[in-house]
Structure formats: structure tokens, C-alpha cells
Amino acid sequence: AKIYTRWFFDLAKSGGPRVNYQAVGSGSGRKAFIDQTVNFGASDDPMKDKDIAKVTRGLVQIPMVGGTIAFGYNYDCDLKLSQEKAVQVAMGMIKDWKELGCKPGKLTWTHRSDGSGTTKAFTNSMEAFSKTWTLGTGKSVKWPAGVGAKGNSGVAGVIQNTPGAIGYVNQSYIKGNVKAAALQNLSGEYVKPTVEAGAKALNGITLDE
């Protein structure tokens, strides 16, 4: 959402039209587009045939930008997560930071409470990481534990204000007390969600036609 806010700010500043863009989550945004209460939307999760069929005015989907999703956390630890440990954290199975090689302390899992393309992408990864993951994939899932918050900003806010909290957010929300964990990739290396790492990953994908 931040990049669209910046683009539309620059557009208005240069004499162009003013665009009212609101980050409401992919679930709400998709419904608003289908109901024709907005002119366009953006999501990390492209619309599928079932929803496209509901758009009577027609639909064009354009790949715009790519980004990374981070495990953001607020704790005194240089956190490195294996794929298995990442899944266990997100499943609410890990309650203490010592289980992740950090000093002992309460771990609080934080997740999205609204329908979210970020959640869809995140759960896709969790399912690919380990058979331990049993929540399926989607814009929303039934989290067995943790604190829910609306939007990337909401999750980042909980982490920022809760020592010992960890959750998933877009890379652009990694700031202040919210640090990014290094996550194990397919090669076994531990990588942080930087612009460079994200660009390298995006160069290796093939977009659907």
C-alpha cells in the first residue's frame, strides 16, 4: 500500500488528479471492486476465475510491483528461522524464545485479522515449507493462537508495542523496534528480506499469462 500512497501523492503534487487510495486489506478491497464502489484495487493475490465472473464491468489485471514478506519481531535476539521453525512459530507451537536459540522470554504470535493478500502469500510459503503446517492457504485462515490485527500497519503496531512479539508483515514495515528475521531458503542459507534479495527471487519466477 505504501508505494501506491507515494505514487498518488507525487501525481497530485505534479498537477495530476487526486486519487483516494485506502489500505483496507485484499478481502475488503476485492468486495468493493466487485460491488463497483471503487475504480481499481491492488492485492498480493490475483483474482481467480470465480471472483472475476462477478465483475460485470470487466477486469484487467496487471503485475505492478513485487515485494518480500518478513518475519518481523521485537526481541533482543539475532533471529534465524529454519523453515520448520518458521512454521512452528506461525502455528502457535512455540511459546518461548529459548526454543529459537534466544534468551528465555514469552513469545507472542501476531497475525492478520482481516482478509489479506499478504496472508495468502505467507500461508502459501508455510504450506510449502513443512507438512507440520495444517491451516491450509488463503486470504484468511483459522489461526490456533496469537493476537490478530488489521492490516500490515496493525500487525506492525502490535509488534512495535509488544516486547516478545513476532508476526508477518510487508518488508516496508520493518523499522523501529520491528526487526526482520533471517529465513532459511531452499539452498539452506539464511536470508533477510532486503530489496536485493527480493529482486533476486522475483527474477526467478514465471508469471501466468
Put a short name on every predicted segment.
Residues 1-209:
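Exported/periplasmic ABC-transporter solute-binding proteins
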